[in-house]
Amino acid sequence: MNQPYSAMRNNIHMLGDFLGETIREAQGNEILELIESIRVLSRDSRAGDEKAREQLLDKLANISTENVLPVARAFSQFLNLTNIAEQYQTISRHHQDESLGNRSLSALFARLKAQGTPVETVIKTVEKLSIELVLTAHPTEVTRRSLVHKHVEINKCLGQLEHDDLTEAEQTKLKRRLMQLIALAWHTNEIRAARPTPVDEAKWGMAIIENSLWKAVPDFCRELNFQLEKHFDVQYEVALSPVRFSSWMGGDRDGNPFVTAEITQKVLRMNRWKAAELFLNDVSDLVEELSIVQCTPEFREKYGDHIEPYRVVVKGLRSKLQKTLTYFGELIEAKPTTVDPSEIITCDNDLWEPLYDCYQSLHACGMRIIANGSLLDCLRRIRCFGLGLSRLDIRQESSRHETAIAEITRYIGLGDYAQWTEDDKQAFLVRELSSRRPLVPTNWTPSPETQEILDTCKVVAQQPEGTISAYVISMAREASDVLAVHLLLKEAGCNYTLPVAPLFETLDDLDHSEKVMTDLFNIGWYRGVINNYQMVMIGYSDSAKDAGMLAASWAQYRAQEALVNLAEKYHIELVLFHGRGGTVGRGGAPAHAALLSQPPRSLKSGLRVTEQGEMIRFKLGLPAVAVETLNLYASAILEANLLPPPEPKQKWRDIMDKGAAISCEIYRGVVRGEPDFVPYFRSATPEQELGKLPLGSRPSKRNPNGGVESLRAIPWIFAWMQNRLMLPAWLGAGAALRQMIEQGEESTLKEMCNEWPFFSTRIGMLEMVFSKADLWLAEHYDQRLVAKELHRLGKTLRAQLSADIQTVLTLAHDGQLMADLPWIAESIALRNVYTDPLNLLQVELLQRLRSQGEVRDPQLEQALMITITGIAAGMRNTG
């Protein structure tokens, strides 16, 4: 193995030793020996030793109730430490150049230069670069914030230990600190006592910005500037902002009754308070720093004749920011405000303009090196975060808006809007949108549900333009769904046009999306207000749950392609908003590969994508890791726009059309058509028990009594990942490919693998899933937990998985899974030794708990929750 990976293994080994010492001290030798014996048996079992496997099963079947908790915690915490070591590896000083390889900005710019791409073309494309990451608190971030903080500190220690010039005393001190942190993590409860509230989730998002992104964004801009200067001898313009952040935390009310208008208002104020605090820190540093005397005559004329002109300007800003902080602090705590609102900073430009004037004056006076220090970082942050910290999306389901408008039309004697035809709805909405008189009578008292919708629209209307980034309509099916939101916002007094983004998320809705947008673009009123800008959101998780991975991904591709062509026809700037998750069943794929597999021209207006739950922590949780993530996103977007992927050949499309139809039929045949499927799913996975895990603020079901279709996409995937069958990520895909091969299409499929990024990414994602799936463990869940009469279904599914693995191997490079990403294969193999005991222990705990009926042993329940979070850490994907 090469040197960087041996360094990573050494780190994992060291962290594991420290964890062992912690356990010995806390629990005693006997427990440590039990844990070690389980680890050795698991390792031997993985290597094919049948006797070791039997001994492992026997040991875990007979484990005492008091021992289940420390054993589950030991393996779970070890997997967390492995994740930390792996995350550190990507930013290690010894590994930096290899980490991004040919996917980095540097490699892309070198390639563009070698190919003779005109500098003007590169600059123009870079100037339009737009990466908007939308942070969402999906109920998959299973690690508590108090543990995350300790994990960040462990990462810092690993970085300090890498320095070659440490004295023995310094090394000992750092190792002792590592042991302290691991001991602190061991003595901290992994599982929250209660579900987080939407406000807790918003605070978690703010903590990511404060602790990581605040530093990462200016660092990334410096990296971008450095690479532009190095390869093309140009500077990146200060006023440009390649990165923006938005959030769903406190704005996403789809299926979450706890996110109310009041909560949204509170989160918006908390964001402003936190932004004021962070900018106050920046500006206070500038007060210390900018003691310079010399400035331009223009600067002196604008800001007065002072000995230290810059200091006077930044002191004025400091005073205003202090008042802004106090003002929003009082609003959040519902105290009477002691600050005059005219004395606070409310718009970004009030902060930007004086600081940019300082920047230009310093430049003009030959002090470029000073201008390009912390002042430049502060300017970059104003452009990226602004005084709202992160913009907020509002999301609500289309039927809620329809119900609200129907209530209004019934009250004013126009009949029931919900019963009208689509044409009648559109005619009514356009008429009302074009009218100056209000629709809602002032003396009317709506139902509480409708009042909540109207109150939310009022909160949106009260915000300065730009604070709310979009109003997303989930389950959007028709043009009237979009017009309805525009009407509700108009009624609330919103005097600017907010981007209203329909979210197309089922197979039928994706196929219908072009028609919906055509209807909208043909409405004169609509074209007049959108200012040639349209955002459309593509749903990945629900479409995959509806139709299976292959059919969903092809429908997403076709919908994006059709929407890009439509927008070009109408000369409208289209931003596609991708609702991806971290898992394959929810559209997840390595960022760079996923972006290059998009249809040509679909990234012309930049990228807007959700970053969800645990992926936020893996990709953005540390400043250096966040810089890498932004580097990958930037290079992929620029590459997609400057070196676009090929248009798929007609024969490739025909194969995808056929394959998608076959795979959808197979997937739905099992998930919808198999009468025993739901009882099998409920018994073979910890789906019922997952509902007890205090993960997110949102209920896991849309309808508590429904079947699979009422289950949210996230717990659906989380449950299958636990028993290692990983069903949603592959069902239907491999079988469809097998049928194509049997029909003589093998050489075309291999051509698609080699020449079409969309298809090769799909095969790569299947390889990843198959590397993590485990037939023996999935069978073990069935044997112990599933009624005999349902065993046939599990047997059929495992046979299908086994056949699918062989099919993908036929198409994969070198005939082995993950051959082109050996370090991921290595990582999965390393984790399996620690994840397997958690799976086996989970089966044991599920069986014991289910046999106890209603009154369950709290110790066993706690241990079960830890196996769930541990397996999630081991798989590096939750939902």
Swiss-Prot record:
Purpose of the protein: Forms oxaloacetate, a four-carbon dicarboxylic acid source for the tricarboxylic acid cycle.
UniProt family annotation: Belongs to the PEPCase type 1 family.
Cofactor requirements of the protein: Mg(2+)
GO CC annotations, alphabetized: cytosol
Lineage: Bacteria, Pseudomonadati, Pseudomonadota, Gammaproteobacteria, Pasteurellales
Protein name, entry field: Phosphoenolpyruvate carboxylase
EC identifiers of the protein: 4.1.1.31
InterPro entries the UniProt entry points to: PEP_COase, PEP_COase_bac/pln-type, PEP_COase_Lys_AS, PEPCASE_His_AS, Pyrv/PenolPyrv_kinase-like_dom
Gene3D superfamilies associated with the record: Phosphoenolpyruvate/pyruvate domain
Keywords for the protein's UniProt record, in alphabetical order: Carbon dioxide fixation, Lyase, Magnesium
Record-level Gene Ontology MF annotations: magnesium ion binding; phosphoenolpyruvate carboxylase activity
Organism for this UniProt entry: Actinobacillus pleuropneumoniae serotype 5b (strain L20)
An annotated GO BP: oxaloacetate metabolic process
Catalytic activity as recorded in UniProt: oxaloacetate + phosphate = phosphoenolpyruvate + hydrogencarbonate
Residues annotated as catalytic: 138, 545
Enzyme class of the recorded protein, top EC level: lyase
PROSITE patterns assigned: PEPCASE_1, PEPCASE_2
